Amino acid sequence: MRFLIVDDEITSRKILQKSLKPYGACDFAVNGAEAIISFKKALEEDCPYDLICMDIMMPNIDGQQAVKEIRKFEKEKGIKPKKEVKIIMVTALGDPKNAVEAFYQGRATSYLVKPISVEKLIEEVKKIGLIREP
C-alpha cells in the first residue's frame, strides 16, 4: 500500500508516518502544490497512492484546493468515483465550514481533527476499507 502524507509541520508528518508505516510506504509533501505533483506523477507511473492524509492550512496551495485539483485530475483521467484515491483530511480546523467544504466540494473520504493518535488514524483507515482486521 502507498500513502502520501501532506503537512507543512514535521511533527504531524512523523506522527502520521509512525501510524501508517507498518502498512505500507509513506511519501511526503509539505504543501498542496507538492501533493498535486506527487499524486499526478504516481498516477502517470501506474503506481497510484491508496491514501492521502491532507492537512488544510499550508503555504502555497492549501489542502482544500489541493483535494479539488486531485479530484479534477482523476475525473480528467476517467477514474470512476469508486476507484478514486481515499483522502483523509487531518487538520486543526474542526469548524463545520471546513468540514463541509472538504466533503462536498473536495469529496474527501474522511475528516479528522488534530491532535490525533495512532489508534484514531488506524481506526479511520479501517473504516474506509484500506486495512482489514486480522
What are the residue ranges of the model-derived segments?
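Alpha4 helix (beta4-alpha4-beta5 surface) of REC/receiver domains from two-component response regulators
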Residues: Q65, K77, K82-K83, G94-S110, ...
